[in-house]
Amino acid sequence: RPKKCIFVENLIDNAMYIRKIDKLLLDWKNYEDRKPLVVRGCRQCGKTSTVISFAKKHYKNVIYLDFHKEKELCTIFSGSLNVDYLVVLISAAIPSARFEEGKTCLIFDEIQECPHARASLKFFKLDGRYDVICTGSLLGINGYSTIDSDAFIPVGFESAINMYPMDFEEWLWANGIQDSVIDILKHHLEEETPVPQAIHNSMRQLLLQYIVVGGMPDAVKTFLATHDINRVLTVQRNIIEGYKADMVKYANPTDKNRIRECFESIPRQLSKENKKFSYSVVRKGARSRDYIGSLQWIEDAGMIHRCYNLNITELPLSGNAIQDSFKVFMADTGLFISLLDEGTQFDILHGKLYGYKGAIYENIVADILGKMGRKLYYFHKTDGIEIDFVFRYKGECTPLECKARTGNAKSLNTLLRHPEKYHVNNAIKVGDYNVGRAGSVLTIPLYMGFLLTAL
């Protein structure tokens, strides 16, 4: 019989952070005809602690099964998936488990490790007495497994939501910034008026720290407890090593080296003047057909955001994307900075974001937009026009330029002078300055990027 599960209280960090996914979890629970829920995301983005904390707040009984640490638990699901039968086996394995209709939540952690448990979600849905929340790494959930897990996916009997590392707004909450301060920022964005200098300086400093620390909860926790960047860097590098361990665990043997080469090329890709992803930077003479699957693997792991070039700046953006022309950004700014040269953190904390040919600026914008769940696009033409990002904002196709220093944006001006050709009427520049407007161009400080949510 499986040994007793770790008691659930031991898995919750006392210093829990407010996460935006909490609202999605509550919306799910309040939906009468809810299905078992799968929370998927990259490794160590806070899935387990968030789900356990939520369940303990909203259910009388929480039953936790970790299929990664206690693989014997999978034997519970190796036979009949009848819910009454499973209740008997789970109760035997976990004597503290209590099953009460409408008051019990089962948490299946690392569900990709036990495909039969995932298959049981259909039966829990049809039974309807107990809620089930699962967590899963993107790799396993997307079918990268040593076993044929696709056959066990209960199509139509589960819901899924994505979870990301902490974004800048969650970082502000973790640092004790109240919503009243964020409301002030929103007001100045809407009115297009400068943020008061004291708030501006504070937000700017918090952003510099966020660029270095990023949103991985362990890195955030370490920084807030110690303010020791070297300790934060150790945490970040351990997370990176965990990703590399996943490459060994999940990837086909023939792909492992190629995946690692693709991943390790990202800083070199972004430090180029032209940041379009080039397979020859991965390895001299490399061809796209040899590496395209490896890059997809990294994307499916939640480690990167792909940013596609556009044929034309016109909605819908997805219909105008060039599939074989793209940039690759790290999904979390802190992990990206941890891959750069020693001392980069020191430079950033002192306001020096100009290095790597603008890569730090572009990657933080990719971090901000990507953690909103947005797809990323840019615009680059052979005639010299290049726009860092293009996104839908307030119903319009909107170019977004990120500038480390103030200056004329020639490409932006070209687009705005020819709306009949480029379908652009307004643009946004983010950089190290306050809110302002010059004609059709709204300038905002980089720390305000998280407020650009309007579709």
Where is each model-derived feature located?
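N-terminal pre-Walker A segment at the start of P-loop NTPase domains
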Residues: 3-30
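Active-site beta-strand-loop-beta-strand hairpin of nuclease catalytic cores
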Residues: 31, 391-399
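Conserved lysine of the Walker
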Residues: 47
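Hydrophobic positions on the alpha1 helix immediately C-terminal to the Walker A/P-loop
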Residues: 50, 54
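Short glycine-rich substrate-engagement loop in P-loop NTPases that contacts/grips substrate
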Residues: 70-102
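Structural recognition of the conserved hydrophobic beta-strand(s) that form the central parallel beta-sheet
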Residues: 107, 131-137, 162, 171
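Interdomain motor-coupling "hinge/lid" segment immediately C-terminal to the ATP-binding subdomain
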Residues: 143-271
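Accessory nucleic acid-recognition modules appended to NTPase machines
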Residues: 221-394
